[in-house]
Regions:
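Cytosolic juxtamembrane N-terminal segment immediately preceding the first transmembrane helix
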Residues: 1-32, 48
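12-transmembrane solute porter fold
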Residues: 19-34, 39-41, 54, 152, ...
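Extracellular/periplasmic helix-loop-helix junction of adjacent transmembrane segments
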Residues: 42-70, 110, 305-309
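Central cavity-lining transmembrane alpha-helices of secondary-active solute carriers
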Residues: 62-76, 126-130, 312-324
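MFS 12-TM fold signature
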Residues: 68, 94-102, 118, 183-187, ...
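Hydrophobic/small/kink-forming positions within alpha-helical transmembrane segments
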Residues: 69-70, 100, 104, 154, ...
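Helix-loop-helix hairpins in multi-pass membrane proteins, especially solute transporters
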Residues: 76, 80-209
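Hydrophobic transmembrane-helix bundles of small-molecule transporters
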Residues: 169-277, 281-284, 310
Length: 466
């Protein structure tokens, strides 16, 4: 069986093995973000069962994000050294175990510890995940498979709250953890006969100084973003995080086997500007579903289920078209396709900034579908451009860096919304502050529109430089 699973020294798998690996990674690409975003709807049920405070419950969400952000960059290098499949498989086992244990949590403290651990072990999956896909398939298929992976990730992020809402309402919040753990076991089964291994820097030593510096700097930055409305505390944490990240960059520039090889950015504008465009894209779009949920439920008056169905228009279009956009980027310059997608997304976000309580729902639906199309045209081709801009030995680092850009962008997006809601003095979501809330939503979309214009600039500069 082992001999049938690999065909050459380049690591390209035969069709049967490649299909199994592809399905395993796509399943995991869905279920990780699905669990990460879906648990949000279970917060009230958790509070009721455990009698937990709002502060304790906030760590159910933030702990997961913190664990992911801390380890996702170092694990990419770890996978390059010890083997991408090996690290990925270990991550799957740990991910399944921590979620199955989460279903048995007896206190909010136990759950918070498990959520942090879930975030940590998810980095073992998302760090080498895309590198594993790209390493095992021919270069001519790279855009297509990245498209399916991106579609799966976005679908998980968007559909998590909807599906988990039903699980929580009709079964229990524990079923979310149970279902997630069991689904991950499917990926483990699909990978069990694949023995081929992929390395990027086999036998290299681990960059301890750089890794420790990043493990300290990343959470400081994220904590600063989460406390941006707390005045000096938030800005002090942000400043400390920024200094730490600059120190991390300096350490990496001197290291023999760096956690992040900063030389990848030197003379490589496609890689540099594609990563910056990715971070700005996530910064401008991640809060979309949150803002639209507030708009549709509080401003317009739809039920939660109806609002969820309307919001699903965006990820459905995105998931349906991402593979086609990825395949298109195999034939046309990826940066060009991504630039068109980012321009469409920017136009859609600016359109959202003009929404009022009387806007016809069909216009809202069209805007969501338009943004979904922009998502598809940007995400997969941009990821393709990033992975195509580095040598095979750097696939693990590139994959982890892209995941880091996603997490940083997501955190920034929610920090912007939190700050705007506070500045607009939105104190109630029961209808009393609808004027202020609508104003905050409009301002947020205008800011995100400006951020997306910056992303267009990064994308165009990349194309010109190339």
């Amino acid at each position: 069986m082992e001999d049938k699973m690999k065909i050459d020294t380049e690591g390209i798998l035969d069709k049967a093995a490649a299909r199994r690996l592809f399905v395993a990674v796509v399943i995991t690409s869905f279920i990780g973000p699905f669990a990460g975003s879906g648990i949000n709807v279970a917060i009230p049920a958790l509070g009721q069962e455990f009698g937990a405070s709002a502060g304790e419950l906030s760590w159910v969400v933030f702990g997961f994000l913190l664990g992911s952000a801390m380890f996702i960059l170092p694990t990419g290098k770890l996978a390059d050294i010890y083997g991408r499949r090996r690290v990925y498989t270990i991550g799957l086992w740990l991910f399944a175990s921590t979620f199955l244990l989460g279903a048995c949590a007896t206190s909010v403290a136990m759950l918070n510890v498990l959520r942090f651990l879930q975030g940590c072990v998810m980095s073992l999956i998302f760090g080498p995940g895309m590198a594993l896909l790209v390493s095992s398939h021919e270069a001519s298929q790279r855009g297509r498979i990245i498209g399916y992976s991106a579609a799966s990730t976005y679908s998980g992020l968007s559909m998590g709250p909807v599906i988990c809402g039903f699980l929580c309402e009709y079964l229990s919040w524990r079923s979310i953890f149970l279902v997630t753990g069991l689904v991950v076991l499917i990926s483990i089964y699909l990978l069990k006969d694949i023995k081929q291994e992929w390395y990027g820097d086999k036998g290299a030593s681990i960059d301890k100084k750089g890794s420790i510096c990043y493990l300290v700097a990343a959470p400081l930055w994220l904590c600063g973003l989460s406390k941006i409305t707390d005045g000096s505390t938030g800005f002090l944490l942000l400043g400390a995080g920024a200094v730490g990240l600059l120190l991390f960059w300096w350490i990496e520039s001197k290291a023999e086997h760096p956690c992040l090889d900063v030389r990848l950015f030197h003379g490589n504008p496609v890689f540099t500007f594609s990563n910056l465009a990715a971070m700005l894209h996530y910064s401008s779009t991640f809060a979309l579903s949150f803002l639209m949920s507030l708009y549709l439920q509080v401003i317009v008056g739809y039920t939660a289920s109806m609002a969820g169905m309307i919001i699903l228009l965006q990820p459905v279009v995105m998931a349906a078209l991402s593979p086609k956009a990825g395949a298109l980027s195999d034939r046309i310059q990826p940066g060009l396709v991504a630039s068109v997608g980012m321009t469409m997304t920017a136009a859609g976000l600016w359109g959202m900034s003009f929404l009022t309580g009387d806007t016809p729902i069909w216009i809202v639906g069209l805007l969501l579908m338009w943004i979904g199309l922009g998502f598809a045209l940007f995400s997969s081709p941009n990821n393709n451009a990033i992975m195509g801009a580095v040598e095979k030995k750097h696939y693990g680092t590139a994959s982890s860096l892209l995941a880091t850009m996603r997490l940083m962008g997501q955190s920034t997006s929610m920090a912007v919304v939190t700050m705007i809601i506070a500045l607009c003095q939105v104190h109630s979501l029961t209808g009393e502050d609808n004027v202020q809330l609508l104003g905050a939503i409009q301002i947020a979309f205008r800011i995100f529109g400006c951020i997306s214009i910056a992303a267009i600039f990064m994308s165009l500069v990349r194309n010109k430089a190339k």
